[in-house]
Structure formats: C-alpha cells, structure tokens
C-alpha cells in the first residue's frame, strides 16, 4: 500500500470536513491526533485512516496554521452575510461571467488556469472553522468540465446553475470554469467565483492572466503572495479619520428611499437580475474629454449623476450610497499584480439643492478625496456608526463599484478573442449594486438588483433616466 493515502491537501480537507459533518472534530496536539465525537467512539475505518495517515494529517494541520491570516473586515462581512439572520442575507458574495470564443482549445485553457492557480495563493484560499483565512499548498490539477451546447436552453440552464452558486467556505475551490461546446466552432466559457477570494480588480487581473497565457503572451507574476502582503499590511488607528467619520455620520442622509416592493426583512429568496448599457467608443471619448475639461475625475462625475438620478425617484432629496474602494497599500513594487480581496468601503452623500450639477460634482469629488485620504479606515466601522445597534440590518444597501481607468483605446482595451456576453453579481445586504467600467474600450454601466424588491418596469425607468442624464452631461456641459 502507498505510504500516502491522501494525494493532496484537498483530500485531507474533505476527509476532515466529512468527519465534522458527522459530529467528529479532529486536531493535532504535538505528535498526536486528538478527536472529539458526539458518539464518543470512532468507526473502525476512521481509526484505520487516522492511524495510516497520521503524518499527513499532522503535516496538514501545521500547514494550515503556518498559512493562517485574519479575514479582512469585508471577508468577515461576507461570511456573516451567508447567515439567514441578516436582512437581505443568506447568500454569498458571488460573481458570474460568460464569454464566447471561436475554436477554443480546452486543454490549453485548462493548462493556463492551473498555472495561474499555482502562482496565486488567493486561488487556494479556504476559511477555517475558527473564522480565519488559510491557503492550501498542494491542490489537485483543476479539470475544466465540458458540456454539449445543443441550443440556447442548455446555455441558459448552465447560467441558472452557476450564476447564483453558493460555495462552501471550508472547501476548495471557490471558483469554477466550464465550457459549453457547440457542433460548430463557437464555445461558451462560464466563469464564476466567490468574492471572498477575489475583488473585482483582481478578477479582471485573473482573466487577463489566463487569456494572455492562452495566447502565448508573457505574464509577470507578482513576487509577493496575497498572504505575505496581508502580513505586511498595517491598519493603525487613524484618529483623524475616526473623528472625520464620527462628525460626518451625524448629518448623513440615509440610503435612497425608492419604491421598494417589499420590506427588506420580508425578502426570503434573494436573487439578482442585471440591467446594463454600453456607450459607444465615441460617446465615451466625448464624456472623458468633458470630464478632463472640468478637471473632474470620472468616478466623481458618474457617481454624482447616479445619485442625482436616484434622488429624483427617492422619497427624500438627500441620500447616501456605499462606495467600493480597491485599497492596495504600496508595500511592494508588485502590489498591483497580486490577486486577492483588497476591498474596503466608505460612504458618500448627495443633497438635492439649487446648486448646479457642476457644483454637485465638485462636492462629490471633495468627498472622494477624503475617501482616498482616509482609505485605511475600515468601512465596517462607518456602518457600525450608522447602525445605532440595529444588528443584522441592511444599513447602506445601494453600492457604487467603480473600475474606471478614465481613458479608453480601441487598440489596447481588447480581451483578445474572448468576448464577454453576460455577467451578474450578488452581495449580501445589498439591494442595488452599480458597476461601472471602461476596460473593454468603452463605458459600460450595469445595475445588479434584487428581483423581489423592484418592479422590473420601475427599475428600467430609473436606469433609462440615468443613461439619459449621462448623455445630457456629454451634450450640455
């Protein structure tokens, strides 16, 4: 019999998880394996495996302890959001994307995915039962499943299956790639992942790495892992930032009071749909030239128009939204190439006044500079200040996730032959998540919203007004 009965870390992890599900907890103590069981006794087969694989299991425990780091506040929020006790909860934070490609070489794609897995520890992340993150050293070769794509129904079925998939935080992997093959040359690549391992910027990096490698391009992998970056990262208390937010929340308006079909606590099935708009390359260029002329940032302009549009439909003229920050501290020269979850969040507000739109944008831009200044301050603390002891409530459920680079090029902004055709996200305690990006060579705006909360025509009308308001800015100013 082989010296090793487990082939890799995931085999051991699955074995231990099966025992835990049966009420048996296993841990290492020096050179001994200890256990606690509801039935007090272990089955003979379990005892046999523990005896034969003692060395492997003890090494596994040491590896997990060696690689352990605390979860970030956002990762912790995602874990909590999976529980049914949270308003708009009982779901994971999840992202799903579909691509089409001609003449896909699945074997080559699979090889490149495995290379990227080996180079990025975030793709080997698990959550321990003690509520920490750890990273597996030795995972099995990831095989990309292939299914036959006979018609649109097969693709739609796969989309339904994967677009809201719920991962087990204690198991590997927390991502999934699969391919639908047609009788012709066209294939569909389905990609989804739990956001506890990757933020939106990292997801973009991941796919760029895989696609670049697939086409034979050189990829420079970071010389620092996500784990080691997090160990270098410091979040020292910032008294100035704390005082700023304590004062700010005193007069901060609440989230947009739109025409919600249900109270948040009444929503049992949290499922999202997406509405989106692609601006042309010419429109995007025109918009960015206007922004440049006023010395604004694209994020300030788009977020202000977003808030102004929501204010037109809100019961109250003032409102606040949750802003996603991609907070990479410059602790290493390769920091921008690391895959992982770097997200922090903060809040910006809008007050409907007689001031011009330009003045409103200036006010937003000033707030955003403050967000940059105090970017190390944990957004979870801001939400705690706002919650006033309302545990489990969705405090700031409208989110602005900005991935704008502020310039576009037809030449450099293409993702090879992989054409993105569909995407959707979901996040616990979020009712509306606005994603805005320009990495495809044009401005793309999308809203992911909870189906049971919004009437479809109502949310479509608001979105249409938003698109028109962006176009008015292009033409009027």
Task: Briefly describe each language-model feature range.
Residues 62-86, 110-152, 171-173, 224-273:
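Short amphipathic alpha-helices and their capping loops
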Residues 35-40, 98-102, 170-213, 298, ...:
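Histidine-centered acyl-transfer/condensation active-site motif
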Residues 83-93, 110, 121-122, 171, ...:
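His-Asp-centered acyl/peptidyl-transfer active-site segments
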């Amino acid at each position: 019999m082989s010296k090793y009965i487990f082939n890799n870390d995931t085999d051991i992890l699955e074995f231990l998880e099966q025992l835990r599900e049966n009420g048996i907890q296993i841990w290492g103590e020096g050179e001994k394996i200890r256990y606690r069981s509801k039935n007090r006794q272990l089955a003979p087969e379990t005892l046999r495996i523990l005896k034969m694989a003692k060395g492997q299991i003890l090494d596994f425990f040491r590896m997990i302890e060696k690689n352990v780091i605390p979860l970030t506040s956002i990762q912790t929020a995602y874990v909590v959001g999976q529980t049914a006790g949270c308003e708009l909860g009982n779901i994971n934070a999840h992202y799903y994307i579909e691509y089409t490609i001609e003449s896909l070489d699945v074997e080559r794609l699979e090889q490149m995915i495995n290379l990227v897995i080996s180079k990025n520890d975030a793709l080997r992340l698990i959550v321990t039962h003690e509520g920490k993150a750890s990273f597996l050293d030795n995972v099995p070769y990831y095989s990309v499943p292939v299914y036959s794509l006979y018609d649109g129904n097969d693709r739609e079925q796969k989309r339904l299956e994967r677009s809201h998939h719920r991962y087990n935080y204690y198991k590997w992997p927390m991502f999934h790639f699969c391919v639908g093959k047609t009788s012709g040359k066209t294939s569909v690549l389905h990609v989804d992942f739990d956001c506890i391992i990757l933020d939106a910027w990292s997801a973009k990096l991941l796919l760029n790495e895989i696609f670049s490698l697939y086409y034979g391009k050189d990829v420079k992998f970071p010389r620092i892992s996500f784990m080691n970056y997090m160990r270098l990262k410091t979040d020292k208390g910032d008294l100035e930032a704390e005082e700023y937010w304590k004062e700010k929340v005193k007069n901060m308006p609440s989230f947009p009071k739109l025409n919600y079909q249900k109270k948040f606590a009444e929503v049992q099935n949290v499922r999202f749909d997406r509405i989106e708009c692609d601006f042309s390359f010419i429109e995007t260029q025109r918009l960015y030239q206007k922004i440049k002329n006023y010395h604004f940032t694209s994020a300030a302009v788009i977020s202000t128009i977003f808030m102004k549009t929501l204010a037109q439909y809100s019961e109250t003229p003032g409102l606040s939204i949750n802003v996603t920050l991609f907070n990479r501290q410059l602790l290493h020269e390769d920091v921008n190439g690391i895959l992982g979850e770097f997200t922090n969040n903060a809040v910006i507000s809008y007050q409907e006044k007689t001031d011009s739109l330009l003045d409103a944008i200036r006010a937003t831009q000033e707030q955003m500079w403050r967000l940059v200044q105090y970017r190390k301050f944990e957004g979870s603390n801001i939400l705690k200040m706002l919650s006033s002891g309302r545990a489990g409530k969705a405090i700031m459920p409208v989110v602005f996730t900005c991935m704008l680079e502020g310039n576009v090029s037809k030449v450099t902004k293409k993702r090879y032959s992989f054409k993105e055709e569909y995407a959707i996200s979901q996040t616990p305690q979020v009712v509306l998540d606005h994603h805005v990006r320009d990495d495809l060579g044009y401005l793309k705006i999308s809203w992911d919203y909870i189906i049971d909360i919004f009437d479809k025509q109502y949310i479509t009308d608001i979105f249409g007004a938003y698109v028109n308001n962006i176009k008015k800015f292009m033409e009027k100013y």
